[in-house]
Amino acid sequence: MAIPRFSSLLRCRKWAKSDWLVASIGCVLIVFFLSFFFDPTSDSVPSVDRSRPIISPSDLVKLKLSSVAKERGAFCLDGSLPGYHFHEGSGSGSQSWLVHLEGGGWCNTVASCSARALTKLGSSNYFEQEVAFQGVLSSDPSQNPEFFNWNKVAIRYCDGASFSGRPEAEFKNGTRLFFRGQLIWEAIIDELLSMGMSDAKQAILTGCSAGGLASLIHCDYFRDHLPKDAAVKCVSDGGYFLNVPDVLGNPTMRSFYHDVVNLQGVEKSLDQKCVAKTEPSKCMFPQEFLKNIRTPVFLVNPAYDFWQIQHVLVPTSADPDKSWAKCRLNIKECDAEQIKVLHGFRSSMMTAIGEFHQNKDGGMFIDSCYAHCQTVMSVTWHSLTSPRIENKTIAESVGDWYFNRKPVKLIDCPYPCNPSCYNMNFT
């Protein structure tokens, strides 16, 4: 994701259209700093305490628009062709594939989706022609020791529903919005299979934020379309969104997901075992469907996820007196009572992942940093100043789990116990 500041998402029990228009614009700003699309020319990024790696020309990977999307009817929100960035693997990694799904929030109204369609989160007309591959996408063995020489793909996010919208939900009254996220996912995966992924011996599906949620929604589909003898696993980064009320007791995220699912026809893309038992929008929450995923999954998530704290727990509309204003922007500015509330959010996450903790094939790295999307920045993925739990970086932990070197169920102690944390500061 890429971001300076956040805007309000909720007003009382319903998010107003004006709120979502502002929020969608906020998502545009947020998505490209924390995802792999770091813009080195931008001067409007959050301040942090660590140095960032210099981007070299070899880090830049060109955009490719899908060659099969048009015939498949797979379009971005505005009707443009979806795209991806592909870096070919080499040597021992030539038959290994890492596919990453970009994040960038969601849109739940015609107004917010229309606004999104005028940005790179809804139209390939605004995509950068080159992006820097960092973190889990890096080809530098010092930054990405486990997967540096794999085939790596970054699929751009331009549908607004975690690659899960369906055309049946589109308007027939002349409103030009294309809800084709599911078709984009299927078309690009088929394209990658034709490029050699059908012969993969090892593969990982990853994603950040809304893309991290998508990596869970589509995990088994990914597994089922690769060779049966391939080692296929999924890694969700910052995609474990909680179904918890905001500080005023309003069902902020649940109401939002309800609107996303209904607007974009997401129900058929969700886990059908879950949908058969409960209201479909609840099946957007990983705690409701993670147990049904057959493919091994690794969760990377901060227990103090700043996106969720700023948008789910304490949206500005739930803070009318602005008593949370400083805390939301910088966790070091939170007072003792606010820290108690944040610890409560952490407790909710611990409860939500409790069942998954018993999954023998699953893995997790749950740190106590004020962060979001940690696999796509080299400084948080694997560097001298990366967050560590039990002296392991995220990259080392994912590697130990993927290659079956050891079980990995790492849960950090509560904030502020971890001095290695990379805490975002939006002031």
Curated annotation (Swiss-Prot):
Report the EC code(s) recorded for this entry: 3.1.1.-
Say yes or no: keyword Iron-sulfur present.
no
Cellular component GO terms held in the UniProt record: extracellular region
InterPro entries in the record, alphabetically? AB_hydrolase_fold, PAE/NOTUM
One Pfam assignment: PAE
State the compartments where it is located.
Answer: Secreted, Cell wall
Q: What is the top EC class of this enzyme, as a single word?
A: hydrolase
Which controlled-vocabulary keywords does the entry list? Answer: Cell wall, Cell wall biogenesis/degradation, Glycoprotein, Hydrolase, Secreted, Signal
User: What are its GO biological-process terms?
Assistant: cell wall organization
Catalytic positions are 209, 305, 372
Q: Which residues are glycosylated?
A: 173, 391
So which residues are the signal peptide here?
1-35
Phenotype of null mutants: No visible phenotype under normal growth conditions.
> Where mainly located?
secreted
What are this entry's molecular-function GO terms? hydrolase activity
Its job: Hydrolyzes acetyl esters in homogalacturonan regions of pectin. In type I primary cell wall, galacturonic acid residues of pectin can be acetylated at the O-2 and O-3 positions. Decreasing the degree of acetylation of pectin gels in vitro alters their physical properties.
> Family assignment?
Belongs to the pectinacetylesterase family.
Protein name stated in the entry:
Pectin acetylesterase 5
Q: Which organism is it from?
A: Arabidopsis thaliana (Mouse-ear cress)
